[in-house]
Regions:
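Solvent-exposed loop/turn elements at secondary-structure boundaries
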Residues: 87-117, 122-281, 481
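Gram-negative outer-membrane beta-barrel transporters
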Residues: 225-369, 373-384
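Signature of Gram-negative outer-membrane beta-barrel scaffolds
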Residues: 1-129, 165, 321-327
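Short loop/turn motifs that connect adjacent beta-strands in outer-membrane beta-barrel proteins
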Residues: 69, 126-132, 220-221, 302, ...
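C-terminal beta-signal and terminal closure region of outer-membrane beta-barrel proteins
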Residues: 519-573
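Extracytoplasmic gating/loop element in the C-terminal half of outer-membrane beta-barrel translocons
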Residues: 373-499, 535-557
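Residues on the lipid-exposed face of transmembrane beta-strands in outer-membrane beta-barrel proteins
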Residues: 58-64, 76, 120-124, 213-217, ...
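Transmembrane beta-barrel strands of outer-membrane/channel proteins
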Residues: 1, 58, 74-80, 136-140, ...
Length: 573
């Protein structure tokens, strides 16, 4: 991978490349990394991990009619994970890990111990007329095993693959062919380093305990459903980077910013070939609670109405948002211990969701063979959860994207040091914050005081940060703007008999995101319900920050905010 320092460095490389004047002494790139198979071990430069696995599942269930109106269901599910290969033993690493009491080894094979999931449920027709039904259940759920996380440990034992990494490289060309990187790697003087992925010895697969209680009832001629679902983590995953450890100091002690007490780290594998050691561990922390209420009304003239509201709170230690071990660790933003992250809102926490629909059906014709359906669907929900982090390695753990922001007070901003020579071009007023604070058409170098003014205004303009000054921006503590989306469904169906069997032909047309069709400023999508990361300012090192005011965290997605039309044809026989 090639990491340019910033857009200015990319623009310079592009201009020099077009002109044929690449400067071998210029630092175009911030970092260059290249992974290659160790052919002395693999015998094949395009080696792939010999990973194979399977899963057996068995389920037994019985229903007991305690009374005609009360049913009790109980069952037992069993999953057996199967692993047909074992990761390669890296004996030098295993000895190093044992000497440091890490409790890990590269050739640890996960067991095929059965995973038991007992479940019970009930259904009670209270008045025996189906007007008031109480139902619920309790059980353990395993689900499908995320084999992609497991496969990392087969690929990265530290033997088959080597990684070359250099900061601020000089004399490297931008080679786009992934199979042609050897030319650049050959120019690097350092030996290839080893990233190692391992399990803790007693690693268990993820399981949750889930309970639900629902009440279906009819009131005022409307069918209602109230339901609560609670899921408690029994075993979930999180990652540790064993190649770093806390120094015993805090960021505040090192920089003089005494309000920020996040721990500082140092590398523990200096002088070894092990650049990163990511270990997969279990945690029992985490839960999800859903509360919902739904109302439905069906009219005998063909109109069906529905509306529902769901409130959600989802907490986790690590949301497991990546398929790669290193990313799951380094992008799990934290303000505390990166190897023991705090329980916080998850990347999937969408607290409010509203749904409503109105469908009208009408049949006509001599034999009622024609049916027309018109539907209007509304979906409203909280935007994607997000975090605000500082780009740069504030705590020395080697990761540039996992340090949650401290939300400073104005007095603390006055004490912060800011970088010099920060250029900003807002001559066309494309950055609202800069226009608001520095006036229209600003184009020049920001002073420290101007950066302080921009940061004060930015914090003050954000509703969440304004109310949480003097705190860390907790992981996924806020959500992007609430979204409103309307869809339209139109369908025309014709029914007929063929050989005594009823057949039908249906033509349908759906308008998805109707609001955006009517007005380009309506129907905006601010995310996909999945956690987002924003890094509006940088940490330059030695207690110095850079804030240029150009970041717009709450911008909408221009692609998914567009309206779409969908034409369908269905034949049923």
């Amino acid at each position: 991978s090639y990491d340019f320092t910033d857009k200015a460095h990319f623009d310079k490389y592009y201009a020099d490349f077009i002109a044929g004047t690449i400067d071998p002494t210029y630092n175009y790139f911030r970092q260059y990394r290249f992974g290659v198979a160790n052919v002395d071990v693999t015998g094949d430069p395009r080696w792939k991990a010999p990973f194979s696995a399977g899963q057996l599942g068995f389920y037994a269930q019985d229903k007991w009619n305690v009374t005609p109106s009360f049913q009790f269901t109980y069952g037992l599910r069993m999953e057996i994970p199967l692993f047909f290969k074992t990761p390669t033993a890296n004996e030098p690493f295993n000895q190093y890990a044992a000497a440091h009491n890490w409790g890990v080894r590269t050739n640890h094979k996960l067991s095929s111990t059965p995973l038991w999931s007992p479940r019970v449920g009930f259904r009670w027709d209270i008045n025996k007329d189906r007007k008031y039904i109480l139902r619920g259940g309790l059980g353990v759920f395993t689900g499908r095993i995320p084999y992609v996380w497991i496969s990392n440990n087969f690929v990265k034992t530290g033997l088959q693959m080597q990684t070359y990494s250099v900061n601020s490289p000089k004399g490297l060309d931008l080679i786009l062919d992934p199979n042609g990187q050897e030319a650049n790697a050959a120019r690097l003087r350092a030996a290839g380093s080893q990233e190692v992925n391992v399990f803790e010895d007693n690693f268990k697969f993820a399981q949750t305990l889930k309970a639900n209680l629902g009440f279906d009832f009819n009131l005022l001629g409307i069918d209602w459903t109230a339901e609560a679902i609670y899921s408690k983590t029994l075993n979930d995953i999180y990652y540790k980077n064993l190649s770093v450890d806390k120094t015993g100091q805090t960021f505040g002690q090192v920089t003089g910013y005494d309000w920020d007490n996040r721990p500082m780290y140092e590398r523990t594998t200096t002088g070894t070939p092990y650049s990163y050691v990511y270990a997969l561990y279990n945690t029992s922390k985490g839960y999800t609670l859903n509360l919902s209420l739904k109302a439905e009304k069906h009219f005998n003239f063909g109109l069906d109405l529905m509306a529902s509201y769901t409130w959600t709170r989802s907490m986790s230690v690590n949301s497991g948002t990546s398929s790669v071990a290193g990313s799951n660790w380094m992008f799990n933003a934290t303000y505390r211990d990166a190897n023991d992250p705090e329980l916080s809102l998850s990347a999937y926490n969408v607290p409010h969701r509203i749904q409503a629909s109105a469908y009208y059906h009408t049949n006509y014709g001599a034999r009622k063979q024609w049916e027309t359906t018109v539907g209007l669907i509304y979906q409203g929900r909280s935007g994607s959860p997000y975090v605000i982090e500082v780009y740069g390695d504030m705590n020395g753990d080697g990761a540039n994207g996992n340090d949650l922001m401290w939300i400073p007070t104005d007095a603390q901003i006055d004490k912060m040091k800011f970088a010099s020579n920060v250029r900003v071009n807002n001559s066309k007023d494309i950055y609202p914050l800069i226009t608001k604070v520095l006036g229209p058409g600003f184009n020049g170098t920001l002073t420290e005081d101007q950066q302080r003014s921009l940061m004060k205004q930015w914090v003050g303009d954000d509703s969440y940060m304004r109310d949480h000054r003097g705190e860390y921006f907790k992981r996924y503590a806020d959500n992007l703007a609430f979204e409103h989306h309307f869809d339209v469904h139109l369908a025309q169906k014709y029914s007929f008999k063929v050989g005594g069997q009823l057949n039908s032909l249906e033509l349908s047309f759906d308008i998805i995101n109707l609001g955006n069709l009517l007005n380009k400023d309506w129907g905006h999508t601010y995310g996909d319900g999945f956690g987002r990361y924003f890094s509006p300012f940088n940490y330059e090192g030695n207690g110095v920050f850079k804030f240029d005011g150009t970041h717009v965290a709450r911008n909408y997605d221009t692609y998914y905010s567009r309206w779409r039309g969908q034409l369908g044809l269905r034949y049923t026989f």
